Regions:
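Short helix-loop-beta junction
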Residues: 177-187
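Iron-sulfur cluster-binding cysteine motifs and their immediate structural context
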Residues: 74, 89-113, 118, 122-140
Length: 204
């Protein structure tokens, strides 16, 4: 629970009651909240004064117990990163597009925090050197699955296949009215994030 101190208070009463420095779950009631990124870390709730969002957070927080496995969505090769050379700053594309603020400058290359990274994939799609690549699933695994789908479609007598890539947030719409409007040759392929598809996949 995040509560800001008033101007006259040296420290918020809520802060004074804290017995540890790290938490798995945070309900930030500040407006604006302490964290401003578009994609907040898992377990961080910021209703921003929205009563419905606050109700959802209060309902979900007690259910978030136990452990979960967070995948590592990326591979990073700092040797080919074009972020900087000899003290001269270069490419900042991944820094500019990451909605989770998981990427930071580390001098002549960037570094990615695997705990903040949520697999949006825009960094891998926009990286000019391939220093950041998407790893969950890998391009090879994705293309292998797509080939299997296409072969099965062809063997069943299908023609002129149309691949429709969509993310998990669109799954409900695809299964409903939106999917019903697709032509017969459309084959939906669900991804963690559409941004994870780069030119290497489009041109394969």
């Amino acid at each position: 629970l995040s509560l800001a101190a008033s101007e006259d208070d040296v420290e918020s009463p809520a802060v004074a009651m804290l017995t540890q420095a790290r938490f798995d779950l945070v309900l930030d009631l500040g407006d604006p909240p302490l964290l401003q990124q578009e994609a907040l870390p898992p377990g961080y709730y910021a209703p921003r004064g929205d009563a419905d969002a606050l109700d959802r957070a209060i309902a979900e927080l007690p259910e978030m117990r136990g452990e979960f496995e967070k995948p590592k969505y990326f591979n990073l090769d700092p040797e080919i990163c074009a972020h900087g050379r000899r003290g001269i700053r270069g490419c900042t594309r991944c820094l500019d597009v990451c909605p989770a603020w998981a990427i930071t400058s580390a001098g002549e290359h960037v570094t990615v925090d695997p705990n903040l990274c949520q697999g949006f994939g825009s960094c891998a799609s926009i990286c000019p050197t391939g220093a950041i690549t998407y790893a969950f699933p890998s391009t090879g695994d994705l293309l292998g699955y797509v080939r299997t789908v296409l072969v099965s479609y062809r063997d069943a007598g299908g023609a002129d296949p149309l691949l429709v890539f969509f993310d998990s947030e669109s799954a409900e719409a695809i299964a409903g009215e939106l999917g019903a409007a697709f032509p017969e040759n459309a084959m939906p392929v669900e991804l963690e994030e559409v941004g994870s598809i780069g030119m290497d996949a489009w041109l394969a």
